[in-house]
C-alpha cells in the first residue's frame, strides 16, 4: 500500500491522500450530530440536497462536500441526496443555475434559490442547517421587522455571501 500523505487538517476532519484517492474520516463529531438531530426535529416536508461535483475539477473539495452532505442527510429521514456531475448533467445544472463545483442546491417543496458553492463547513455549517430547515418548513427565522423590510423591496434581489476558510 502506498505511503499516505496528509493533505490538510481542519478542526474535526482529516483527509489522507493515497496516490490521488481521497480517504476521509467523519466530518461531523458525535456532539455535532446530536445538535443537528435536535434542529432537524423542526423539519416538516422532504428536502433534497443536490450535489454537483466533478472528478477532475476540485476533486478533493467535491469529495469533502459530498461526504458532508451525506453525513447531514443521514441525520433525518426527511432529507435525500442526489449527486450530479456538472459536465455530464449540464441540463440539470443549468436548470438550477449552477456553473461551478463543488455546489450544493437545497431544494424543498419549492426551489428557494439556496445554493452553496464550496464546502459549507466552519461558520457556514449553521447556515446550511438553517437553509435545510427553511426549505422544509417554508418559514425563514426572520423577525417581523425584517419581513416588513423585505416586503418593501421593489423587485427580486440576488444576495451572495462570500466567506473564507476558517
Spans of model-derived segments:
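Thiol-based oxidoreductase modules, predominantly thioredoxin-like and allied folds used
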Residues: 77-89
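Structural micro-motif
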Residues: 46, 90-114
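Catalytic cores of nucleotide-enabled group-transfer and carboxylate-activating enzymes in metabolic
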Residues: 46, 83-85, 101-104, 135, ...
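Long, charged amphipathic helices and adjacent flexible linkers at domain junctions
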Residues: 135-153
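Non-catalytic, surface beta->alpha helical segment in thiol-disulfide oxidoreductase systems
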Residues: 105-139
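Polybasic, lysine-rich low-complexity intrinsically disordered segments
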Residues: 3-7
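Local sequence-structure signature of Cys/Sec-based thiol-disulfide redox active-site neighborhoods
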Residues: 39-75, 152-166
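Short, positively charged and aromatic/hydrophobic N-terminal segments
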Residues: 9, 13-23
Amino acid at each position: 500500500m502506498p505511503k499516505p500523505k496528509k493533505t490538510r487538517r481542519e478542526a474535526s476532519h482529516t483527509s489522507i491522500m493515497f496516490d490521488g484517492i481521497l480517504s476521509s474520516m467523519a466530518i461531523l463529531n458525535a456532539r455535532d450530530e446530536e445538535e443537528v438531530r435536535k434542529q432537524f426535529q423542526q423539519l416538516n416536508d422532504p428536502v433534497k440536497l443536490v450535489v454537483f461535483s466533478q472528478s477532475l475539477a476540485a476533486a478533493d473539495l467535491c469529495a469533502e462536500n459530498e461526504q458532508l452532505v451525506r453525513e447531514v442527510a443521514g441525520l433525518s429521514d426527511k432529507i435525500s441526496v442526489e449527486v450530479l456531475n456538472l459536465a455530464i448533467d449540464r441540463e440539470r445544472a443549468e436548470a438550477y443555475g449552477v456553473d461551478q463545483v463543488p455546489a450544493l442546491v437545497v431544494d424543498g417543496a419549492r426551489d428557494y434559490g439556496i445554493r452553496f458553492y464550496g464546502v459549507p463547513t466552519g461558520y457556514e455549517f449553521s447556515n446550511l442547517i438553517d437553509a435545510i430547515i427553511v426549505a422544509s418548513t417554508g418559514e425563514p427565522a426572520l423577525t417581523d421587522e425584517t419581513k416588513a423590510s423585505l416586503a418593501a423591496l421593489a423587485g427580486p434581489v440576488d444576495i451572495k455571501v462570500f466567506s473564507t476558510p476558517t
